[in-house]
UniProtKB/Swiss-Prot annotation:
One Pfam match: Memo
PANTHER family assigned: PROTEIN MEMO1
Family per record: Belongs to the MEMO1 family.
Protein name as catalogued: MEMO1 family protein Pcal_0028
Disulphide bridges: none
HAMAP family hit by this protein: MEMO1
Domain of life of the organism encoding this protein: Archaea
Species in which this protein is naturally found: Pyrobaculum calidifontis (strain DSM 21063 / JCM 11548 / VA1)
Length: 281
């Protein structure tokens, strides 16, 4: 079995299990966190959503909102996590079809059946473990998943070719696979929002992008990001989840929490935006 060791434990999150658990509980209880590990359901069924991937001390309280919301719907069999490939390593659209990833909480196994279904539906995706070797955007979701849900599997997908056409093709391939899989799966887009501008600028730019996400308008999201120079590192993964949501009949999106790194660090001159957004029906 291929075992991926943590790349950012001790940097983005604590490397000891007890300290990591305390950090996640800190995130839940934080002033801008959800305050509870389980939130009331919106509608009847959730697909998943958008979740940030910065260091837990910055984005953990916002990330906790999505996981607490999903906990209200019950545990899935599997998470599919689409993240940006920040390093441009490996295939333009990469998947791992087998193996496990290790965190301080233990191993999370890849769902080989679902990974194979996704890969069979999209000829451009490549089974490429190297693409994930340094990438944090997917790794940082796993301790949250392990804290909230026991004995679940996952499928990692990393994307550096973040075009609208690629995003749509990937979203449709995932939707087709989920219809064939016929078990509960949560689909996540791991993304931060605007980068390295003052708090007020980041909030204003993020609001424009979030508005398009809530409208389930993936083309509009790419348009406003381009026209207003909104640096959303996971815009492709977000667009793919929007497309999958529409394909699968999840026509509602709710903003659970929006904040910036300035809200957690107190430093507001150069900030990064974070949002937790839920797709449901």
């Amino acid at each position: 079995m291929r075992i991926r060791k943590p790349a950012v434990a001790g940097y983005f999150y604590e490397s000891r299990a007890d300290e990591l658990q305390a950090r996640i509980e800190w995130s839940i209880k934080h002033e801008i966190g959800p305050k509870a590990p389980v939130l009331p359901k919106l509608g009847t069924e959730a697909l998943g959503g958008v979740v940030p991937h910065a260091g837990y001390m910055y984005s953990g309280p916002v990330a906790a909102w999505l996981y607490s919301a999903l906990a209200g719907y019950g545990a899935p069999t599997t998470f599919v996590i689409i993240g940006p490939n920040h390093y441009g390593i490996g295939a333009p659209v990469a998947i791992m079809k087998s193996g496990a990833w290790e965190t301080p909480f233990g191993r999370v196994e890849i769902d080989e059946e679902l990974a194979s279904l996704i890969a069979s539906n999209y000829r451009e995706i490549e089974d490429d473990a190297h693409a994930f070797s340094k990438e944090h955007s997917i790794e940082v979701q796993l301790p949250f998943i392990q804290y909230y849900f026991k004995n679940v599997k996952f499928v990692p997908i990393a994307v550096w070719r973040q075009t609208l056409s690629t995003s749509r093709e990937l979203g449709k391939a995932i939707a087709k696979a989920l219809r064939e899989y016929k078990r509960r799966v949560y689909l996540l887009a791991s993304s931060d929002f605007n980068h390295y501008e003052p708090h007020d600028v980041t909030v204003k730019k993020d609001d424009m992008a979030i508005g398009k996400i809530l409208e389930l308008d993936e083309a509009g999201l790419f348009d406003v990001a381009s026209r207003f120079d909104i640096s959303i590192c996971g815009i492709g993964p977000i667009a793919s989840v929007i497309v999958a949501a529409k394909e699968l009949g999840f026509s509602n999106a709710a903003l659970l929490k929006h904040a910036t790194s300035g809200d957690t660090s107190g430093y507001r001159d150069e900030t990064v935006g974070y949002a937790s957004i839920l797709f449901y029906k």
